[in-house]
Amino acid sequence: MIRLQIVERPEANLFKVLKRAMRSGELRTFSLEKAGSRVVHVRSPGYMKWEDTGGVLACEIRTPREEGKEWQLLTNFIGRVVDRFPTLVQGINIQVDAPPPEPPRKRRKRAARR
């Protein structure tokens, strides 16, 4: 899972602008699901849950079917936002959750010889 925070410039309304662009077809490779609370990409696996928290877009990227592929949606989304809306973005913060460690292997006990 990757967490992403996009800090918008004052009075930018980046969340509304992005939702409008996705719904109108200006951003053709992205679409909204679940009443606009989830973003999906045409080719990248997974989805991004997002919400507006007063000047900061809080996003969480997940790929439940293909673990470790979050980076594809991340690069597509950041690239598109920075390319199309550079005047609305002030900063981007990315936080990566490390995968849980693998459990140690259990050793089998040998059968006793008789």
Language-model segments: which ranges?
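Helix N-cap motif at beta-to-alpha junctions
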Residues: 10-12, 64-67
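Short acidic, gly/pro-rich beta-turn/loop elements at beta-sheet edges
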Residues: 14-16, 50, 69
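A short, structured beta-strand/loop element
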Residues: 34-60
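Negatively charged, low-complexity tracts enriched in Asp/Glu with abundant Ser/Thr
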Residues: 1-36
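Short, solvent-exposed polar/charged micro-motifs at secondary-structure junctions
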Residues: 15-16, 39-43, 101-107
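Short secondary-structure junctions
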Residues: 25-32, 43-44, 85-89
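Short, highly charged C-terminal tails/helix-capping segments
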Residues: 89-114
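C-terminal structural segments of small proteins and small subunits
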Residues: 66-95
